[in-house]
C-alpha cells in the first residue's frame, strides 16, 4: 500500500451482522512507526450501526488501545497513546485500527459497497468495504 492509501474490511462481511468487527489500515508517513499525538477519526457510512459509546478496550491502534474513544453520530475518534522518548525518524508505514466485536458496530442491513473515511491531522483517507447478502 502506498502512502496515503487505505483498506478496510468488516468481519463477518454479511449484511445485518451485529456485532461486527472492522479493520482499517492507513498508510502514511509515521514518526518512529507510531501514529503520533493527532487523533484518528474514522467516519462510517450512515447505513452502518454505531453505538453511542465505544469502550477503549474494544479498539486497537496497532498493538495498543487508544487513550480515549469518543463517538459523534457515525464518527468514532480515537486518541492514540502519547509516544514516549525522543525519535526523529520519519518513514512510510501503516497504522492498523481494529474495532473488535466488543465495539458493538453493526454492518449495514443491505448488501453493497460502502466507503469508510478516516483522517489523521490534515491527512484524509477513504477505503471501500464490501458487504455481502445475508
Regions found by a protein language model. Give the residues of each.
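Ser/Thr/Pro/Gly-rich, low-complexity intrinsically disordered stalk/linker tracts of secreted
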Residues: 1-134
Amino acid at each position: 500500500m502506498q502512502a496515503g492509501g487505505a483498506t478496510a474490511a468488516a468481519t463477518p462481511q454479511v449484511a445485518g451482522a451485529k456485532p461486527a468487527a472492522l479493520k482499517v489500515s492507513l498508510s502514511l508517513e509515521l514518526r518512529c512507526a507510531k501514529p503520533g499525538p493527532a487523533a484518528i477519526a474514522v467516519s462510517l457510512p450512515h447505513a452502518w450501526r454505531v453505538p453511542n459509546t465505544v469502550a477503549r478496550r474494544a479498539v486497537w491502534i496497532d498493538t495498543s488501545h487508544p487513550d480515549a474513544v469518543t463517538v459523534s453520530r457515525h464518527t468514532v475518534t480515537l486518541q492514540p497513546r502519547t509516544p514516549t522518548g525522543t525519535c526523529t525518524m520519519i518513514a512510510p508505514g501503516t497504522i492498523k485500527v481494529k474495532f473488535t466485536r466488543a465495539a458493538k458496530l453493526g454492518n449495514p442491513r443491505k448488501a453493497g459497497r460502502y466507503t469508510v473515511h478516516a483522517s489523521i491531522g490534515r491527512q484524509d483517507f477513504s477505503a471501500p468495504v464490501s458487504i455481502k447478502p445475508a
